[in-house]
Amino acid sequence: MKALSLVPKPKPADKAIIEPGGLPSIHIPAAIRVGSVPYLNARPLTRFIASPIAKLEPKKLAAELRAGKLDVALVPLMEVLESPANTYRIVDELAIGSERAVYSVYLNYSVPLAKIKTVALDPASKTSVELARVILGKFHRLKPRYVAPGEPADAQLLIGDPAITHRQAHPEQNYLDLATAWREHTGLPFVFAVWAVRLPYWKARSLAGQLRTAGRLGLSWRDAIAHTPFERQYLTEHLCYDLGPRQKKAIEKFAETRVQTERLATTPKLSYI
C-alpha cells in the first residue's frame, strides 16, 4: 500500500519543530481543544501533535465535539454525515480508512453467516454499527435482530483495540471483516474516521494545515511508532490514511446506502478544507 500519495509537500508555515529528544512535533494553539479516539489506528495522525489531546471512545468523542466541548476531533464518519450542513469542516487528504481487510472492525459469528438471527452491536462507534447494518441487510439480505452487547447473539460487532485483542486470542473463530465486505460489494475503500473541525474558516484552514503536517510525520515514522511487528503490519498494511477522490466517492456511496434504507434523511453536502 502506498502511503499518502495524494498529499502535497508541507507549506513552510507548517514545518515541524524538533524537540530536544530529536523527534519532530506540531504545536496546536493552546486555545484549540483537540480530541481523538484512543485506538492504535489513530496513532500516526496524532503521535506528533504536541498539544493535549482528549482521548475518548468514538461515540463519546462525537458527543463532545457536537456539544462544542472540543474544536476539532478525529471522529467517526457518521458524526459528519448525520450533522446539519456547515456544522463541520473536514480536514482534507487524511482520514482513517482501509483498502482491504481492516482487521479491527468485524462481525464475530458462531453460526453460518446466512443463518444469523441476532447481532450484538458495539455502541462505541455508530459508523461501524451502520456499516454492519449495510453489509448484513443490503448486501446479504438478512434481517437480524440487533441487541445490546452481552446479550445472547449469533454474532457480535467488535471494533478498535479490543477487537484486535479478541481476534489474536481466538484465531479459530469466524470473522467477517467489514472493510473487506464493503470492498467486495462496492469496489471501494471504506473511511471510518475523519478530522472534523468546528471553527471559523480562517482558523479551520490554518489548523487543517497543521493536522496534515502532523499526519505526514506520523505516516513517515510508522516503523518507529509501531511497538511490535503486528502494530507495524496493522498500520502499514491494514489501514490507509488517504482521503482522496476514491475515498470521497466511498463516503458518498455509504451515505447513499443509508438514505436508501432511511437511516439518513438526505445525502449530506460535505465541506473539505
Placement of each model-derived feature along the sequence:
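Domain-level signature for soluble enzymes in the chorismate/prephenate branch of the shikimate pathway
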Residues: 1-273
